[in-house]
Amino acid sequence: MQVILLEPGRLGKTGDVVNVKPGYARNWLIPQGIAAPATASNMKTLEAQVRARKKQQEREKAQAEDLASRLNGVAVELSVRAGEGKIYGAVTHADVADALDKLGFDVDRRRIEMPKTVKEIGEYDIAYRAHPEVTIPMKLVVHAQK
């Protein structure tokens, strides 16, 4: 029996059409909401959902590329309390996100990639992953507060 997977799992990813034994489909997959029968109407609905998902992904990628063009070459400068080259505490993803917010860029702190923990004054290479296919390199400049 052919079913359309509604949730990712052992059988495949969401939207895949897979062959399973009829009893497994009737008694487990369909009642649990993991799959739906592969009827003509369900296939049309699936195709419409796939098209809508593709359009959404293209929109998200275009937005990420627009953000990349605006963020290109931006240096994030942070003033932190420090003593003898070492800073008190560490520069976190949230600190970088706040600095970018002050510059007028609304970013998600969880998408900021920092190669290591920043605990010293200096210049660091960081990146912002705006989309799985779009990574924006930036400079982080940490200097002592005066």
From Swiss-Prot:
SUPFAM superfamilies: L9 N-domain-like (SSF55658), Ribosomal protein L9 C-domain (SSF55653). The keyword Transcription does not apply. GO terms for molecular function: rRNA binding; structural constituent of ribosome. It holds the Pfam family Ribosomal_L9_C. GO terms for cellular component: ribonucleoprotein complex; ribosome. The keyword Ribonucleoprotein applies. InterPro entries: Ribosomal_bL9, Ribosomal_bL9/RNase_H1_N, Ribosomal_bL9_bac/chp, Ribosomal_bL9_C, Ribosomal_bL9_C_sf, Ribosomal_bL9_N, Ribosomal_bL9_N_sf. Disulfide bonds: none annotated. GO terms for biological process: translation. Keywords: Ribonucleoprotein, Ribosomal protein, RNA-binding, rRNA-binding. Binds to the 23S rRNA. Belongs to the bacterial ribosomal protein bL9 family. This is Large ribosomal subunit protein bL9. The gene is rplI.
